[in-house]
A protein has these predicted regions:
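An extended, acidic, His-containing surface patch that forms the Zn2+-binding/catalytic region
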Residues: 125-170
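Histidine/acidic-residue-rich, glycine-tolerant segments that coordinate divalent metal ions
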Residues: 1-83, 163-168
Length: 170
């Protein structure tokens, strides 16, 4: 946080878009003692989670921030049974609309490739969230000069970009 009485301004895209992703990996249930008779969705989902991180590190420009976070991973209910499905959900955040669309396509392509290779199926659903917060340069400059006038230049600073999302983006 910043000290009270200080305000920051950032013209242009300041906060990320935010989408929720929901993934179901569809395997084939089986007994833990006979894994060869099952298609283990937990193992496949684990591969998906790891592979999604390569989208960030290997498929996007390092100067274009992107976040893919899987925050929920649920598979199975009994310790000696391979379940038939595993559920994943997470968030995707970007700072430009094209990267947002491209990232969601790459996510599905990654899931499809891994599940096909394992003989499994999948469902992929996106719940679109907030767009990126884009501050108008003109209005930002006007508001910043007003803040300098009322608070003093020493209390006004250049803000920074965040990968958080904000409903004010609408």
């Amino acid at each position: 946080g910043k000290p009270a009485g200080k305000v920051g301004f950032y013209p242009g895209v300041m906060m990320a878009s935010q989408d929720e992703i929901y993934i179901t990996i569809k395997g084939k249930a089986g007994h833990g003692a006979k894994p060869q008779s099952a298609i283990d969705p937990i193992v496949i989902a684990s591969q998906v989670v790891l592979a999604l991180q390569t989208i960030v590190s290997r498929n996007t420009d390092p100067y274009e921030p992107i976040v893919i976070t899987i925050g929920k991973f649920v598979g199975g209910t009994i310790n000696n049974v391979i379940p038939d499905t595993t559920e994943l959900s997470g968030t995707v955040r970007t700072l430009n609309e094209k990267l947002r669309r491209d990232t969601l396509k790459l996510i599905e392509r990654t899931i499809k490739g891994i599940t096909q290779a394992a003989g499994a199926g999948y469902e992929f659903r996106v719940s679109p969230g907030y767009p990126e917060l884009n501050n108008s340069a003109k209005e930002t400059a006007f508001t910043q000069s007003s803040a300098i006038e009322f608070l003093g230049k020493e209390n006004v600073f250049k803000g920074e970009r965040f990968m958080f999302a904000e409903d004010f983006a609408y």
